[in-house]
Amino acid sequence: MRPMHMLLSAGVVVMFLGCAQGDVPGGDVADVKPYGAVPQPDTHPSVLYEHAVQELEAGREDSATFWFYAGQLRARVFLGCEESGATDGDEQLLGALFDTVGNTINPVAFADIDGAASIMTDVLDWDLTHPAPYIDYEACSATHEEVRDGLVEFRQHILDNADDMRRTREENGLANR
């Protein structure tokens, strides 16, 4: 699937969010430096994915990467903890967005592996300072820690394998920054 078609597919999924999820909380705007104005952290993880797509379409690749991984972290905690109240509709929606948006953003993000790793650190910092009110962090502490640890491990994996990843990208005709 071509990148623009993936973005359009993600847009269609988000457009029908109301059908799968119901009302999505949030909508206020906060400024997260250097990633710009975004929905407040109390928004459903799908809104963070949608914002990532908008940032990518606007040419703000680092911001798109940040909001994709912020959405992914929130989605995994939300879906992984029974006390969060996630529904089957949430699981289907977030899975579709992860696949569609991730397949569009990751090739862009990993053109700069060191930059992507730095952005993941920023996501982890943001997550600690901007809790989502729809997640019961006391009841979900083990899940939250496990998901955060997974992102830390993934970050380290890409740094440890950066040379191989760059070489593979070159072999596949993808640019490195």
Feature map (PLM): residue ranges:
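Bacterial N-terminal signal peptides that target proteins for export
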Residues: 1-8
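Short, charge-rich amphipathic alpha-helical segments embedded
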Residues: 61-62, 66-90
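Hydrophobic/aromatic side-chain positions at a characteristic register within alpha-helices
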Residues: 56-57
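Long, low-complexity, acidic Ser/Pro- and Gly-enriched intrinsically disordered regions
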Residues: 22-40, 84-177
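C-terminal motif of bacterial Sec signal peptides marking the signal peptidase cleavage site
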Residues: 17-18
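Conserved small-residue packing positions in alpha-helical repeats and bundles
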Residues: 52-53, 69
